[in-house]
């Protein structure tokens, strides 16, 4: 089985490829499309799916915690800018608000384990 990494930033996507090649994160495929373009069919056959993958911190952390690469899991760290003070708090009107797309994929694919995170801002 293999992992799916979704990351639109070209620099971060290349880092993912480098880390995969070096064996530091689960082997897999890096998809640079927007999550809004990803369908449930695109995810068939992947054991792990990492959305907003950045430089593979979820895959790395799971390995460090003893989570095997062949154990199914979905992870994601949605962009915080739509709701953060630094991001001007445009909320649901912000084009970076991608939770609905990820939530839809979770609903349709129904993975057994999903980990997500969102950091709190310094102002709460």
Predicted regions and their residues:
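Conserved active-site and SAM-binding loop architecture
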Residues: 1-124
